[in-house]
């Protein structure tokens, strides 16, 4: 598509170059630029895309979109100006790739906890209902026969629109997508209208210099999803649901356990354990449902998926089958071992998620509840204090270690976690083992019959980042290999 057609009514202005320049792709990473690419210069806190424009052109980019002119670009390179490059990038990518979101039923899931599990449960239900479903989120992007890792829960708009195009071309009619607050703030999901939006819950998270300024801003961006939905599905038990729903024009459908709701589960849900798999069973309108994940929060996630599925017209048989059969990598994921104790791997990496998980595991009455965890480098220090505090309060023994330290010294991170441990319960015993692999070995070597070992923070991730270098690190494999040696 040429620049003239591509930029029509987008607010972009051609500063110089040929309006008939053909564009075949849109990117914001100069390393991904190639012949026919439109490179979008995104300003950022730590790096400015304008500084990489020449590199993108050298790689073959046919045009550059900027907020201001970039000196030194070759004469043959077309240069576009836009006041809001993120909005412009979303509009241009959607147009170039043929507005793929319009060809599918789009479902967005947002909230502090439960996005990934709810999205996977809903996708499983819709697949059981006969739909061809794509899934985008923290665990990557997948559709039948395809799977790719992602750098963000919600990818940059140029990447997202291309992925949606590939889904449509491969026959997908539905897409379930986790929509993060940062994805909304940075317009990664712009140009997408959602048939259904799902709100799971809200608690303080992603607050810091590189994320949200405060909780009010975090809430603002969470509710932004529902300004682009035809139907909103809301957790009516969440204390912030009133603020999330305030002033919205979409049709609202609520779910819950404690408060009156359109879809309400009985409060007498049961914990289940079969074949080493922890689960729960609950009742809605006299019908019994099972979900293969433990605890109250799994009931809430299943209720969210059930409610959204009903809004979308899924059959009851599909709802039962999808909820019972779904497995989510890195979400209270059991590691099958021939051992008298249980090991679960979970992505819980903030105070709220860790508290929900540990309280749930406590309900299974373990001999000891052992938490193995760290916190990421170059992220909010408040998260470290919170993780340390909640684990000290709810675990019987803590093993603190690294978790994607990035460029920050591990000892600095561990010092913050230790401060959190003292705040939570200074009497809780703990071990400090900076190497995460050795920390896992330590937990396994000292496990007692009836223990539950919860390895927190990385979940589905397949690498660990140290000093800017990512190394292979799959916790399920580490546990299985060490125990089976």
Per-segment meaning from a language model:
Residues 1-91, 95, 227, 239, ...:
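N-terminal leader/targeting and accessory segments in enzymes
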Residues 32, 275-277, 282-397, 419:
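Nucleotide phosphate-binding/pyrophosphate-handling subdomain across enzymes
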Residues 6, 37, 56, 92, ...:
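Residue-level signal for inorganic ion chemistry
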Residues 64-68, 249-275, 291-296, 320-324, ...:
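Beta-strand->loop->alpha-helix junctions that form or flank phosphate-binding loops
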Residues 64-72, 137-140, 236-240, 257-258, ...:
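Short, polar loop motifs at secondary-structure junctions
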Residues 207, 471-485:
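Short, flexible loop segments at boundaries between secondary-structure elements
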Residues 5, 9, 64, 68-76, ...:
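C-terminal helical cap/extension that packs against the catalytic core
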Residues 10, 89-236, 240-248, 285, ...:
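Phosphate-binding loop of NTP-binding sites
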């Amino acid at each position: 598509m040429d620049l003239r057609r591509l930029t029509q009514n987008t607010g972009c202005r051609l500063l110089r170059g040929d309006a008939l320049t053909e564009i075949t792709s849109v990117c914001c990473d100069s390393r991904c630029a190639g012949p026919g690419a439109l490179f979008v210069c995104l300003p950022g806190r730590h790096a400015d895309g304008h500084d990489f424009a020449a590199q993108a052109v050298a790689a073959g980019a046919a045009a550059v979109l900027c907020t201001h002119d970039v000196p030194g670009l070759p004469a043959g390179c077309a240069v576009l100006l836009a006041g809001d490059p993120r909005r412009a990038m979303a509009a241009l990518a959607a147009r170039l790739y043929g507005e793929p979101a319009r060809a599918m039923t789009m479902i967005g899931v947002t909230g502090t906890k439960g996005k990934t599990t709810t999205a996977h449960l809903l996708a499983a239900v819709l697949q059981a209902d006969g739909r061809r479903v794509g899934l985008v989120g923290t665990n990557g992007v997948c559709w039948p026969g395809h799977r790719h890792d992602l750098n963000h829960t919600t990818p940059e708009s140029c990447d997202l629109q291309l992925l949606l195009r590939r889904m449509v071309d491969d026959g997908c009619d539905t897409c379930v997508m986790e929509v993060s607050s940062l994805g909304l703030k940075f317009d990664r999901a712009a140009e997408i209208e959602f048939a259904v939006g799902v709100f799971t819950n809200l608690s303080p998270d992603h607050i810091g210099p590189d994320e949200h300024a405060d909780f009010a801003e975090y809430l603002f961006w969470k509710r932004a999803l529902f300004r682009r939905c035809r139907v909103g599905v809301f957790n009516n038990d969440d204390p912030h649901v009133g603020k999330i729903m305030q002033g919205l024009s979409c049709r609202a459908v609520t779910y819950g356990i404690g408060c009156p709701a359109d879809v309400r589960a009985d409060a007498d849900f049961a914990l289940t354990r079969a074949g080493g798999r922890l689960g729960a069973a609950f009742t809605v309108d006299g019908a019994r449902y099972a979900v293969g994940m433990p605890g109250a929060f799994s009931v809430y996630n299943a209720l969210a998926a059930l409610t959204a599925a009903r809004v979308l017209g899924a059959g009851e048989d599909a709802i039962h089958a999808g909820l019972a059969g779904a497995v989510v990598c890195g979400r209270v994921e059991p590691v099958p071992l021939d051992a008298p104790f249980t090991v679960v791997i979970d992505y819980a990496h903030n105070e709220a998620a860790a508290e929900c998980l540990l309280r749930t595991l406590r309900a299974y009455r373990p001999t000891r509840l052992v938490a193995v965890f760290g916190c990421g480098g170059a992220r909010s220090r408040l998260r470290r204090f919170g993780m340390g505090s909640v684990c000290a309060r709810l675990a019987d023994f803590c093993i603190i270690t690294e978790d994607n330290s990035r460029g920050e010294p591990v000892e600095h991170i561990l010092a913050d976690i230790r401060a959190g441990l003292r705040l939570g319960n200074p009497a809780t015993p703990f071990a400090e083992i900076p190497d995460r692999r050795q920390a896992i070995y330590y937990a396994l070597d000292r496990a007692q019959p009836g223990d539950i070992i919860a390895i927190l923070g990385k979940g589905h991730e397949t690498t660990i980042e140290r000093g800017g270098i990512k190394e292979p690190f799959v916790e399920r494999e580490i546990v299985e290999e060490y125990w089976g040696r």
